[in-house]
Amino acid sequence: MGQPRGQPRGQPIAHRRGSVIGALLLCALAGCAAPLRVQPSPAAPPLVGRETVNATLWMQRAAEYRISAEQVYGLAAERLTTTIAAPGTAAVEQQGADAATLARLPTAVIVDLDETILDNSFYQARRALAGAEFDDASWDAWMLEGAATAVPGAVAFLQAASRAGHRIFYLTNRSCPRGTAPGAACASRAATLRNLAALGVPGGADSDNLLQRGDRPEWNGSEKSSRRTWVAERYRIVALAGDDLHDFVDRAEYARRRAELAPLFGTRWFLLPNAMYGSWERAIVSGSCTPGMDAATCAAANIARKYALLDPAPAL
């Protein structure tokens, strides 16, 4: 019988296999194995719009989101007969006011609109699919559709608050083109009112209940204190609901008065979850875009800022 091909003469096959296995074992014990390859980081951040996909899907598909929203509004409905019914106010703009004067005022509940009453995750999904960020033109087109659905639990709470005798004000940073607010010429305002009426919220078709940014000259900014002050001059504000800290108080004021104001959450203030956008996100990307930057470059700068602020390690 001839010698097997490739085997050195005079060396049994079993002995050679044992030598190879032994060499491998020695190498492993000595730590001479090749180091694990670390995959390089991507050369560029994800496509514009992609970073909102998980948040949008969570709000559209997750049972946890629906449960969270219904839980907030369920608590608010329970509070209608306890803390909301008690003397006092939910508005920082009315704190320090004469108690007897407040007691004589009719009562009101102020709610934010987008992601508090109206679910705009469909708009966010469209922007993600298009690989684009928010812009005024696409947002205006979405508002004109009047197709937003209700945030889970919102309609039932508002109906209960209305039955309890509270007027509902819808305070929103939606706005009309300059020179048209708040008249019938503002198509987006009319579409918003139709949207609210179709959902069956109390007073949703009444234009006087919709307080948009820019409806009055002094309501020009995105801050909401001036509009709450307008309501506070006419009503005792017994509850606030929103998805952003600015729906309740200025962020800087809350930081100064946190110990004093925090107990209002869950008693007169009711905060809805929104991971898609908000003043928290604007604070993160503030300053990443510079004057003259085009939209694509600005979007890329915003994404780069977000990645730079990710914290991979807990503080020791």
Spans of features found by a protein language model:
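Non-catalytic pre-domain segments flanking phosphatase-related domains
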Residues: 32-111, 289-316
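Second-shell loop/turn segments in exported
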Residues: 58-67, 140-148, 170-183, 214-218
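Surface-exposed patches in mature extracellular/periplasmic domains of secreted proteins
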Residues: 84-101, 166-173, 204-209, 241
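C-terminal cap/substrate-recognition subdomain and adjoining C-terminal extension
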Residues: 179-316
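Active-site neighborhood of HAD-like aspartate-dependent phosphohydrolases
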Residues: 106, 117-159, 163
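Substrate-recognition element of Asp-dependent hydrolases with the DxDx(T/V) motif
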Residues: 115, 154-196, 243-245
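Bacterial N-terminal signal peptides that target proteins for export
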Residues: 6-21
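Bacterial N-terminal signal peptides
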Residues: 19-31
